[in-house]
């Protein structure tokens, strides 16, 4: 860990949009501390822990997650990931790598949005079959894009691998057999989890696999799956 002053990552006490950020901070051996906010129980789901300070943190666009690094105060999860990644040359080097990074960064967010909408929908059980029906087609696109590369930008690890690992893992928890038809995606997951810093983090007390979503969600809202 760096001896410099720690970054502060603020987010709900869930996995959510902060998981890839936490993974990247751990992988890069960045000194950081977390400010975790707790959402209240049903039926009100009181968010006052966050709302009471939301406009007092000098954030340009107050939201969660946020990252504070000295005078730099950043919101938007992908902006946070890029900020950390730039410090470690993990945004792609060649033009081809940068294009692949940009594509997969946005594709992952589209994919994530679909799962989030399903998980928070009051019609979750009604909509779930359609999601599962379309899931193999979605995953096939990721599989074809990855091809024979080790990582999604090519042969060099970039921040989008952290994003992609997270959303593939969420879908794997949602439907445990969903990656079985895609050996290269399964190999990617194993390769990522075998990275020394990632493997150590997964085994640590700081890591939590669940809950993925907040308490008002219909799925992924419990400490265990």
Swiss-Prot record:
Catalytic activity, reaction form: RX + glutathione = an S-substituted glutathione + a halide anion + H(+)
Key words of the record: Cytoplasm, Isopeptide bond, Transferase, Ubl conjugation
Presence of the UniProt keyword tRNA processing in the record: no
Cross-link position per record: Glycyl lysine isopeptide (Lys-Gly) (interchain with G-Cter in SUMO2): 54, 73
Coiled coil segments of this chain: none
Top enzyme category: transferase
EC number: 2.5.1.18
Chief location bin: cytoplasm
Any one GO cellular component localisation term in the record: cytoplasm
Keyword presence, Metal-binding: no
Binding site for glutathione: 11-12, 50-54, 63-64, 76-77
UniProt cross-references to Pfam families, sorted A to Z: GST_C (PF00043), GST_N (PF02798)
Domain (GST N-terminal) ranges: 5-92
Matches recorded under SUPFAM superfamilies: GST C-terminal domain-like, Thioredoxin-like
GO molecular-function term, one example from the UniProt record: glutathione transferase activity
InterPro entries: Glutathione-S-Trfase_C-like, Glutathione-S-Trfase_C_sf, Glutathione_S-Trfase_N, GST_C, GST_mu, GST_superfamily, Thioredoxin-like_sf
UniProt-annotated binding residues for substrate: 120
PROSITE patterns: GST_CTER, GST_NTER
Residue ranges constituting the GST C-terminal domain according to the UniProt record: 94-212
Biological process terms in GO annotation: glutathione metabolic process
Intracellular or extracellular location(s): Cytoplasm
Family: Belongs to the GST superfamily. Mu family.
Complex formation: Homodimer.
Cited function: Conjugation of reduced glutathione to a wide number of exogenous and endogenous hydrophobic electrophiles. May govern uptake and detoxification of both endogenous compounds and xenobiotics at the testis and brain blood barriers.
Protein name from the UniProt record: Glutathione S-transferase Mu 3
């Amino acid at each position: 860990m760096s001896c410099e002053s720690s970054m502060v990552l603020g987010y709900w006490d869930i996995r959510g949009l902060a998981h890839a950020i936490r993974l990247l901070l751990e992988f890069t051996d960045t000194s950081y501390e977390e400010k975790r906010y707790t959402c209240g129980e049903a039926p009100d789901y009181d968010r006052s822990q966050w709302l009471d300070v939301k406009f007092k943190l000098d954030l340009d666009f107050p939201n969660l997650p946020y990252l504070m690094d000295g005078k730099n105060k950043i919101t938007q999860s992908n902006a946070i990931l890029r900020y950390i990644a730039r410090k470690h040359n993990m945004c792609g080097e060649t033009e081809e790598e940068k294009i692949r990074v940009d594509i997969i960064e946005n594709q992952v967010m589209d994919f994530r949005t679909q799962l989030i909408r399903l998980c928070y929908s009051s019609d979750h059980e009604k909509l779930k079959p359609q999601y599962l029906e379309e899931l193999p087609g979605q995953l096939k696109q990721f599989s074809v894009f990855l091809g024979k590369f080790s990582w999604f930008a090519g042969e060099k690890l970039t921040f989008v691998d952290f994003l992609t690992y997270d959303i593939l893992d969420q879908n794997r928890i949602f439907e445990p057999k969903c990656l079985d038809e895609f050996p290269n995606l399964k190999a990617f997951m194993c390769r990522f989890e075998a990275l020394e810093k990632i493997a150590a983090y997964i085994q640590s007390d700081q890591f939590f696999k669940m809950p993925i979503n907040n308490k008002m969600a219909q799925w992924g809202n419990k400490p265990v799956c």
